[in-house]
């Protein structure tokens, strides 16, 4: 089915703002149950006290839920933010998104982070965070289209997921590319969040954050794996949240001191390039290197933080990952 033939359940138009000092100055609220979409201002007090990222997530979640909210309550929210440094292309790791919700595993607030391009693209689209609330009666897709660029008109829509829309991310990603991206550059400037059918059967569901790999000309995914946020996402009957932005550069984030940002970023890159191969080895092992280090220092959260180490750690540490799953 073509995008223009899909049933739009709710629509919200807005003017795409310029970013200033890492902020768009507004957050996006979407209630998939009631079909409500609105923008909410980011106050100076929010910036001063909570900065962004996890801070904004917790602030917005606090005001969205109540004392009786459980993970499967309609008023439970999933909040995603990248923070003021998100999308600063000079900095390694600035593609991170942080998501928060009330966990189906613990019934308390948790947060989880992931790479990919969704967080920065969300901000480039004019939003410092997104709140997803409510529970839909049908599977829906949330789209954020800011392809008109700064000063243009953007659109947020809740769309009825058509019958040919897959659930599982590895298939859904191809469908989204074919349906919402007309050209290769369109695919590079689009990112989405989804989960899979497995989240229907577990409270440990992950969120998948996409990025388009220009060299491979294909999608890759990063996971927010803590706390079962994907289970909450699927319970709300959201298939995907898609964001489209426009071309961006080193100054898109509106830094107060671009020269200092560039110099600091260059210093960080040199340090990572020099020391990562002999210290963390993140390039070859990813976050699996943390398993051994945390076990050595009695910090590994074994059995829900009852213990800090486990005798079987050598079976799943970075050495095993590098031997079994990489091409090094």
Per-region residue spans from a language model:
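Intrinsically disordered, low-complexity segments enriched in small residues
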Residues: 1-113, 117-328
């Amino acid at each position: 089915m073509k995008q223009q033939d899909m049933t739009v359940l709710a629509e919200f138009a807005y003017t795409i703002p310029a970013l200033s000092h890492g902020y768009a100055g507004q957050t996006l609220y979407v209630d998939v149950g009631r079909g409500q979409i609105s923008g909410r201002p980011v106050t100076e007090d929010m910036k001063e006290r909570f900065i962004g990222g996890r801070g904004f997530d917790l602030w917005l979640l606090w005001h969205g839920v109540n004392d009786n909210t459980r993970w499967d309550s309609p008023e439970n929210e999933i909040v995603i933010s990248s923070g003021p440094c998100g999308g600063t292309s000079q900095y390694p790791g600035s593609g991170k998104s942080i998501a928060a919700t009330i966990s189906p595993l613990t019934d308390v607030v948790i947060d989880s982070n992931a790479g990919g391009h969704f967080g920065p693209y969300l901000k480039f689209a004019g939003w410092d965070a997104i709140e997803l609330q409510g529970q839909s009666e049908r599977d829906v897709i949330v789209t954020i289209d800011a392809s008109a660029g700064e000063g243009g008109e953007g659109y947020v829509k809740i769309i009825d997921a058509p019958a040919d829309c897959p659930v599982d991310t590895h298939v859904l990603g191809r469908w989204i590319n074919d349906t919402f991206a007309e050209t290769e550059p369109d695919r590079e400037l689009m990112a989405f969040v989804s989960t899979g059918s497995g989240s229907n059967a577990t409270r440990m569901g992950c969120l998948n954050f996409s990025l388009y790999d220009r060299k491979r000309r294909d999608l890759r995914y990063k996971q927010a794996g803590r706390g079962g946020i994907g289970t909450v996402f699927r319970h709300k009957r959201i298939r995907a949240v898609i964001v489209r932005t426009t071309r961006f550069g080193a100054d898109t984030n509106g830094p107060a001191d671009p020269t200092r940002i560039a110099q600091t970023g260059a210093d960080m890159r040199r340090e990572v390039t020099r020391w990562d191969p002999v210290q963390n080895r993140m390039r070859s092992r990813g976050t699996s290197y943390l398993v051994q280090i945390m076990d050595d220092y009695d910090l590994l959260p074994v059995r829900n933080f009852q213990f800090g180490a486990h005798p079987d750690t050598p079976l799943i540490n970075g050495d095993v990952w590098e031997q079994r799953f990489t091409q090094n």
